[in-house]
Amino acid sequence: METRVQHGSGSQALLQARRDSGRPHGEPDLRDVLTQQVHILSLDQIRAIRNTNEYTEGPTVAPRPGVKSAPRSASQPKSERPHGLPEHRHFGRVQHTQTHASPRAPLSRSISTVSTGSRSSTRTSTSSNSSEQRLLGSSSGPVADGIVRMQPKSELKSSELKPLSKEDLGAHSYRCEDCGKCKCKECTYPRTLPSCWICDKQCLCSAQNVVDYGTCVCCVKGLFYHCSNDDEDNCADNPCSCSQSHCCTRWSAMGVVSLFLPCLWCYLPAKGCLKLCQGCYDRVNRPGCRCKHSNTVCCKVPSVPPRNFEKPT
């Protein structure tokens, strides 16, 4: 028989002709009766069924496509595949048809095998992930908005966040019993005469340096610095000191140098004036106690009652 057969109907006609050639014309075939009772689905109907999306966006649980189509696959294992074709060819044709059915959405494929008797039929079920991605996108919206991407800046200063210590609470509460002034270290520290840097911060302009350079004592300090062999000797800093070593030698050397530099005789009076100015400046600017021997009294700050802001009647 030289007839051109096509995909579905041609193979069935070929099988029907082979069965008719081997039996009498009067007897009905049992296979024909079963084939007429079982509804055979065409490729177009299979493609329309597989393309449906059974996902829902509501909280209700949708029935799974595998559970719903299980009775159909069990009752019709032979009708989904044409008779006489190999199993792998039929599976490749169905998979190719379903791939071209929905090319726009990403598909997730799962293969399930159902066995009936000694034969098994392979089914391919496809489902779209677009609803799943839409649900995930809507649920992750509030979470993404609540993420802190930048550290908020604190409006409080660092000094306000520090806990108050005992020294801060009672820093100025200790008073002198005689004069009544504060006896903390900050208030009792002696105040010195002001000074500043000049010549691009290379020279310190202070009252002590003015006296040293004005009376040529800086030359004597340089002479003692280069003639001293002891690194720990401080005679170059205080050449007129009587408490350090080599006191007689230093005073004798200064007497000889004063013959060539008579301005050295003004050093002692200028030093006395500097001490007097320093004492006056300290007395005016030091807020604390200057008593040498006095008792300390702890004074508490009196509590001020809250003001009443009500209007008088």
From Swiss-Prot:
Location(s) in or outside the cell: Cytoplasm; Membrane
Domain of life: Eukaryota
Entry's Gene Ontology cellular component terms: cytosol; membrane
Biased composition (Low complexity): 108-131
Biased composition (Basic and acidic residues): 17-31, 78-89
Family assignment from sequence similarity: Belongs to the sprouty family.
Protein name per Swiss-Prot or TrEMBL: Protein sprouty homolog 2
Lineage, opening ranks: Eukaryota, Metazoa, Chordata, Craniata, Vertebrata
Gene: SPRY2
